[in-house]
Amino acid sequence: MTPEYFLRSLLMMILAVFSANASNWLYLAKLSSVGSISEEETCEKLKGPIQRQVQMCKRNLEVMDSVRRGAQLAIEECQYQFRNRRWNCSTLDTLPVFGKVVTQGTREAAFVYAISSAGVAFAVTRACSSGDLEKCGCDRTVHGVSPQGFQWSGCSDNILYGVAFSQSFVDVRERSKGGSSSRALMNLHNNEAGRKAILNNMRVECKCHGVSGSCEVKTCWKAMPTFRKVGNVLKEKFDGATEVEQKKIGSTKVLVPKNSQFKPHTDEDLVYLDSSPDFCDHDLKNGVLGTTGRQCNKTSKAIDGCELMCCGRGFHTEEVEIVERCSCKFHWCCFVKCKQCHKVVEMHTCR
């Protein structure tokens, strides 16, 4: 494959990413690298309707690989968090990558938008701290001595830069259209909730200095939570998401709980407009793979149990042989040696 052909192919894929759906940029996760976007002329060829994205590309060529990594993080975390649910974040080789699931105003779409905006903020911030980007570095506003008496030092994660870039890049489609439709307001709210899942869970990491670890001096820095922590927080918000509707207060359109008996949602909560399908049956047109063939837990009464996972269709049971580590022993010094044991277990899959 010639460099020219590769570049043309890459441009066609990225052009598709910036069309139609606001979450189509997630398709960048399926590209091995976007390093070929290294000249402003390349960005000019992105003839998508959102010119501000083209301008961002031109001004931030080096950041695009972090956007790709953010998309990968988002998809991987979504698949982990929903691994035991009927909808398990399966991706398609088409646009949008989650199918039409994200084009509906469901709570699943709310999670996808939140984890995606968080993924970009996280990946860009990590690139800043790693010294991979010229435009940003560590957070130099964190310095001096803290009220607790330790010295701020090291490389504090520049989360504000990552959040600002995520806002500019991820929110651009909704904001370019005025951001006043019900769906635009929903997307913008969930995008921000995703970023707040990082901001509100920043932690302080420290290192002791002194003779024999006496900690005569302690230096600390601010660090982002793990992305697994971010995913856990947003999954909890998904479980307690608020169904909303649009209401006009004065000249401003806002989202309010559809049930007036419910308390107003906060900036950290996820919101949705439409009820979710049951995800039971195969419907590739809408990006729903169904649950036929999915593994289930025979003894569980939760959503991963065979009764709920299989939507009442029943399940198959077969015996399979697995190999696992066993009889592990620690040997001085310093390794663990295990045997391989063969074990026959029952595996249950939905009809």
UniProtKB/Swiss-Prot annotation:
This entry's Gene Ontology molecular function terms read: cytokine activity; frizzled binding
Q: How is it modified after translation?
A: Palmitoleoylation is required for efficient binding to frizzled receptors. Depalmitoleoylation leads to Wnt signaling pathway inhibition.
Q: In which tissues is it expressed?
A: Expressed in the brain and floor plate. In the developing pronephros, expressed in the proximal tubules and nephrostomes but absent from the pronephric duct.
Q: Where in the cell is it found?
A: Secreted, Extracellular space, Extracellular matrix
Q: Which keywords fit this entry according to its UniProt record?
A: Developmental protein, Disulfide bond, Extracellular matrix, Glycoprotein, Lipoprotein, Secreted, Signal, Wnt signaling pathway
Q: Mainly resides where?
A: secreted
GO cellular component terms listed in the entry, alphabetical order: extracellular region; extracellular space
| The keyword Signal is annotated on this UniProt entry | yes
InterPro entries linked to this entry:
Wnt (IPR005817), Wnt4 (IPR009142), Wnt_C (IPR043158), Wnt_CS (IPR018161)
What is the residue range of the signal peptide feature?
1-22
Disulfide pairs here are 78-89, 128-136, 138-155, 206-220, 208-215, 280-311, 296-306, 310-350, 326-341, 328-338, 333-334
In the induction comment, the record states: By Notch signaling in the pronephros.
Per the record, lipidation of type O-palmitoleoyl serine is found at 212
Chain positions carrying an annotated carbohydrate: 88, 297
Q: Which CDD domains match?
A: Wnt_Wnt4
- BP-aspect Gene Ontology terms: canonical Wnt signaling pathway; cell fate commitment; embryonic pattern specification; glomus development; nephrostome development; neuron differentiation; pronephric nephron tubule development
- Thylakoid found in the keyword field: no
Sorted alphabetically, which PANTHER family does this protein's record hold?
PROTEIN WNT-4, WNT RELATED
Relate the protein's function as given in its record.
Answer: Ligand for members of the frizzled family of seven transmembrane receptors. Plays an important role in embryonic kidney development. Acts downstream of Notch signaling during pronephric kidney development. During early pronephros development, patterns the proximal pronephric anlagen to promote glomus and nephrostome formation. Also required later in pronephros development for tubulogenesis.
Family designation = Belongs to the Wnt family.
Protein name as catalogued:
Protein Wnt-4
| Species the sequence originates in | Xenopus laevis (African clawed frog)
Encoding gene (name): wnt4
